Amino acid sequence: MNYITFPTAQHAVEKIAQEFVIYSQLNHPAHISLSGGSTPKLLFKTLAQSPYAEQINWRNLHFWWGDDRMVSPSDPESNYGEVQKLLFDHIQIPAENIHRIRGENEPHFELKRFQAELSAVISDGVFDWIILGMGADGHTSSLFPHQTNFDDENLAVIAKHPESGQIRISKTAKLIEQAKRITYLVTGEGKAEILKEIQSTPAENLPYPAAKIYAKNGVTEWYLDKDAAKLL
């Protein structure tokens, strides 16, 4: 595992923000998939501020989501809504560069629509960069232990939270694994035990999707703060 440890979550987020600047200056549009959760909120707030808000060529970045809950964008549970509030409302970015999962739609209709958009915009299915989180149960995106089909050939899937039953749409494991780069952004001491388990146990012996999903032809790295990394 490629673990990179930062003193704090803010340091990890600053590194990602610096890399957004680099991606925005490529000679082709860069397709980046975002994650929900508390640490990404820190990232979005950082990107919306100086110097990044000015340094990044937002026209060259296309944003997608690893997953989203089937709620309206105004709902506090919406991953897209969070980014809109913390980042998009504060920068100049073309509307066509934002490829959200439309949580207000009927799930099966939206699954079909979202997969069609993915196919049309990223015809080879290869993302430049996918940023993922990891739950304390080892889930990533909305791919949960004991209910993820790692061989699903579709681009996206309807998922149900194992406890709340909440419906989401998620990228499939196979689509994520085609990315040029995957960065797991994991912070806080609440993740220390599971990171230790992932480090010390072969992935095939674990139920955790975050332990099993990696870039098949690219780079996979884990950005951790020192609290998350304390048992490694």
From Swiss-Prot:
GO molecular function: 6-phosphogluconolactonase activity
Any one Gene Ontology BP term: carbohydrate metabolic process
Key words, A-Z: Hydrolase
Involved pathway(s): Carbohydrate degradation; pentose phosphate pathway; D-ribulose 5-phosphate from D-glucose 6-phosphate (oxidative stage): step 2/3
Entry-linked SUPFAM superfamilies: NagB/RpiA/CoA transferase-like (SSF100950)
Cross-referenced InterPro entries: 6-phosphogluconolactonase_DevB, Glc/Gal-6P_isomerase, NagB/RpiA_transferase-like, PGLS
Repressor keyword on record: no
Catalytic activity: 6-phospho-D-glucono-1,5-lactone + H2O = 6-phospho-D-gluconate + H(+)
Source taxon at top rank: Bacteria
Keyword Hydrolase listed: yes
EC numbers, comma separated: 3.1.1.31
PANTHER family registered for this protein in UniProt: 6-PHOSPHOGLUCONOLACTONASE (PTHR11054:SF0)
Family assignment from sequence similarity: Belongs to the glucosamine/galactosamine-6-phosphate isomerase family. 6-phosphogluconolactonase subfamily.
Function: Hydrolysis of 6-phosphogluconolactone to 6-phosphogluconate.
Protein name: 6-phosphogluconolactonase
Source organism of this protein record: Aggregatibacter actinomycetemcomitans
Lineage, top ranks: Bacteria, Pseudomonadati, Pseudomonadota, Gammaproteobacteria, Pasteurellales
Protein's gene: pgl
